């Protein structure tokens, strides 16, 4: 199946300040986004893709002159793929607080003329959804055919259905949860402590010192990556394999293949990801809990949602286990909402939502075909455009 081909990011400077859930306000906010496919004449075939922790607006396609720049969900999105860009107009947007072009900690604070650093305000899933809604306003899209996201992206999809119930017809929530467990919050805290205790962090204002807290970022990524993989995948890929036939009997040297792999992942991550962004996004994960304002009752929290739902989980995902997805399904059933649920037997752990798995992709293909058949008007509209 074909790719969407060469893509070019676009940007939108919001025409008014963005109020945040914390009470702070982003006076000057720019969003970077990409679009794929054609918006039809009735503007009814738009699908918003919400990204997870370390992803971005670059969901599909590749950049000119960069052969290894495929979007993070390129296996899912494109002509003839499960999310078919011959039928849908797909939007990927980088959230505020991230580090891939939208306003974030490395951006210049207009009040000081210096990077925000640690002074960038805390952002939440709800803030991101509000920013995404502003982007849709600028694109002239009143209602989404669907919103889809995996992991943290799935939380944004859920939030869309309660914050803007009339603006989304379908929500596809993949490998997600209605909130973080204590264990997941604990993993995030260990990762954050690794960053803030790095001597190069400088209280979040490391930009002025010309350094990057790479040691902390490496450890944070290593901790996170462990939670993305299943025990079975680790066993099959690495087992107890050593780098060398003979043991070095050292506490400092790398002995096992899994150690080498984790260090490689940490090194790669520290070269491109912003430390302050990591703190912000993991805290947004911690804070997400739509039931909090309803005495912990998720059914009440989702009572205002009118969208139809597809909820997908994976058997070996222990970060956001199938039980957590079934909590979402139960809450929707309690409200007599239209919900489909698929539990995919896949070995990959939490990262399964990013993988090319025939059963998983067939579920999404069938669901998007349903959306297209019931609501998408004939093609022949206008291409995505910058505003």
UniProtKB/Swiss-Prot annotation:
Q: Which domain of life is it from?
A: Bacteria
Q: In which pathway does it act?
A: Amino-acid biosynthesis; L-methionine biosynthesis via de novo pathway; O-succinyl-L-homoserine from L-homoserine: step 1/1
User: What EC number(s) would the UniProt record show?
Assistant: 2.3.1.46
What is catalysed by this protein? L-homoserine + succinyl-CoA = O-succinyl-L-homoserine + CoA
Question: Any idea which residues are catalytic in this one?
Answer: 151 (nucleophile), 317, 350
Coiled-coil ranges (or none): none
Q: In what residue span(s) does the AB hydrolase-1 domain sit?
A: 45-354
Q: Quote a single Gene Ontology cellular component term.
A: cytoplasm
A single Gene Ontology biological process assigned to it is:
methionine biosynthetic process
Where is it predominantly found?
cytoplasm
Q: Write out the annotated subcellular location.
A: Cytoplasm
Report any Pfam family annotated for this entry.
Abhydrolase_1
Q: Which controlled-vocabulary keywords does the entry list?
A: Acyltransferase, Amino-acid biosynthesis, Cytoplasm, Methionine biosynthesis, Transferase
- Cite the position(s) of the site with description Important for acyl-CoA specificity: 319
Q: Which residues bind substrate?
A: 221, 351
Q: Which GO terms describe its molecular function?
A: homoserine O-acetyltransferase activity; homoserine O-succinyltransferase activity
Which family does the entry's similarity section mention?
A: Belongs to the AB hydrolase superfamily. MetX family.
Q: Subunit comment for this entry?
A: Homodimer.
The job of this chain, per UniProt, is described as: Transfers a succinyl group from succinyl-CoA to L-homoserine, forming succinyl-L-homoserine.
NCBIfam families assigned: homoserO_Ac_trn, PRK00175.1
This protein is called Homoserine O-succinyltransferase
Q: Which organism is it from?
A: Methylibium petroleiphilum (strain ATCC BAA-1232 / LMG 22953 / PM1)
């Amino acid at each position: 199946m074909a790719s969407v081909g060469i893509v070019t990011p676009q940007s939108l400077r919001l025409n008014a300040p963005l109020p945040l859930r914390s009470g702070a306000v982003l006076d000057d906010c720019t969003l970077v986004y990409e679009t794929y496919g054609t918006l039809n004449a009735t503007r009814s075939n738009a699908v918003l893709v919400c990204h997870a922790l370390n992803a971005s607006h670059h969901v599909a396609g590749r950049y000119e002159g960069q052969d290894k720049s495929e979007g993070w969900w390129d296996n899912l999105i494109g002509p003839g793929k499960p999310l078919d860009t011959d039928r849908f107009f797909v939007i990927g947007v980088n959230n505020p607080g991230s580090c891939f072009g939208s306003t974030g900690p490395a951006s210049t604070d207009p009040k000081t003329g210096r990077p925000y650093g640690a002074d960038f305000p805390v952002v939440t899933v709800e803030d991101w959804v509000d920013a995404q809604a502003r982007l849709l306003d600028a694109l002239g899209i009143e209602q989404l055919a669907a919103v889809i996201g995996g992991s943290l992206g799935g939380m944004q999809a859920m939030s869309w259905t309660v914050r803007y119930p009339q603006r989304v017809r379908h929500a596809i929530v993949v490998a997600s949860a209605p909130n973080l467990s204590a264990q997941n919050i604990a993993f995030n805290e260990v990762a954050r402590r690794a960053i803030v205790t790095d001597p190069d962090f400088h209280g979040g204002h490391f930009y002025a010192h010309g350094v990057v807290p790479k040691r902390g970022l490496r450890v944070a990524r290593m901790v996170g990556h462990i939670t993305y993989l299943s025990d079975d995948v680790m066993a099959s890929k690495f087992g107890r394999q050593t780098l060398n036939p003979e043991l070095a009997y050292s506490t400092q040297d790398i002995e096992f293949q899994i150690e080498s792999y984790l260090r490689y992942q940490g090194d790669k991550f520290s070269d491109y990801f912003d430390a302050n962004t990591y703190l912000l996004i993991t805290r947004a994960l911690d804070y997400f809990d739509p039931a909090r304002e309803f005495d912990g009752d998720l059914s009440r929290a989702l009572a205002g949602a009118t969208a139809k739902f597809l909820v997908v989980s994976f058997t070996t995902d222990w970060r956001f286990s199938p039980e957590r997805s079934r909590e979402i399904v139960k809450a929707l059933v309690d409200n007599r909402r239209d919900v489909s649920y698929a539990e995919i037997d896949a070995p990959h752990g939490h990262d399964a939502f990013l993988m090319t798995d025939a059963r998983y992709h067939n579920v999404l293909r069938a669901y998007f075909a349903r959306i297209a058949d019931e609501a998408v008007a004939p093609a022949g509209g206008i291409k995505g455009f910058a505003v």
